[in-house]
Amino acid sequence: MTQLSRRAFNREALGLAGTRMAGLLSGLQAGRAAIAAHAGLASSASITDVPGIRAGHFTDPRRPTGCTALLFDGEATAGADYDGSAPGSYLGVLLQPASPIETIHGMLLTGGGPMGLAAVPGAVRYLEEHKVGFDWGVLNVRVPIVVGAVIDDLSLGDGRIRPDADAAYKACQSASTGALAEGNVGVGAGATVGKMLGGHGYHGMKSGLGTASLRLDEVVIGALVVANSSGDIVNPHTGGIVAGARRPDGKGFANIVETLKSFARSGRRESTWLRDPALQSTTLVVVATNAEFTKTALTKIAMMASTGAARAINPYHTNGDGDSTFAISTNRVKSDLGISVIGALAADLVSATVLRAVKAASSIEGWPAARDLAPASG
């Protein structure tokens, strides 16, 4: 919105500002309606609906782990918001506004804990072989910038099995503009939720990867979420728990926050009930748009998008989490939709996508999924 001086702040200016504000509100309302339309599990809604993005998975058949590659056709700009206390990233520092690097060529989301970041060079190799990257001024050398982020899934199966460079290369080979598969695939293969009370008879649940998109005329916003949290997954519209910590007797959800309150009141502070969770949870969020934005603007959009996950995960950003949110622009269209509008719509889309991540998941041994339990209030 154009900034008005005091002298220009007259009735005409007020009318102009009011008209613009009405347009922004109209955009928000249209966006919320589009999000509601995609709130189910329709396979047509995907981050790959954003022009300029291809995505693919590699899912390891030996244990629940894998990786997901996002490849950008043309010059993509990105910003990030790291609100978790222990994020695992590869070249993530390049997304800071102060970095001179303005373009990235790919992103790899991977399981395997910190060691899983060793997979990222496989995506770099794939892009280099396809002549994607910065011209380094050396004959036939191009340097692709691939940002990596990791979740901890080492407790599922044999933790010595992790995504490696070959796994990332295969994820890139499978990348397409088609609808991206959801659930126990790629980096979502080892995602779980509701782990904050683990080790005390309470049990978490299987989660996965979810994706969704919305369109506002020529502007497209997409989201991808890997829900791998210490906290419960909550429907922000009803307050009901969709997936999370289950009671030791198997009769419903524990409700982590209420359980923590009850133990605090009972004076059980000498036990491990009230200690911080181990470093075993990280939720990864990617939002993308074809609307043109700078790295600084995308950093703010990432901050706003992160609040969407906080509406659906409780508690979120615990001391043991590495929660990370990325915002990407493929710079295909110029739009008058501002940072706050895109950020608000992205946050709502992220909330819906968190729910998709758990609803699309399938049970594995010891980790039931929401779809396999009796219907809950969420």
Regions found by a protein language model. Name each.
Residues L14, I35-G378:
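Alpha/propeptide regions of enzymes that mature by internal proteolysis
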Residues M1-L25:
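N-terminal secretory signal peptides and thylakoid transit peptides that target proteins
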Residues L24-A37:
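Signal peptide processing junction and immediate N-terminal pro/mature segment
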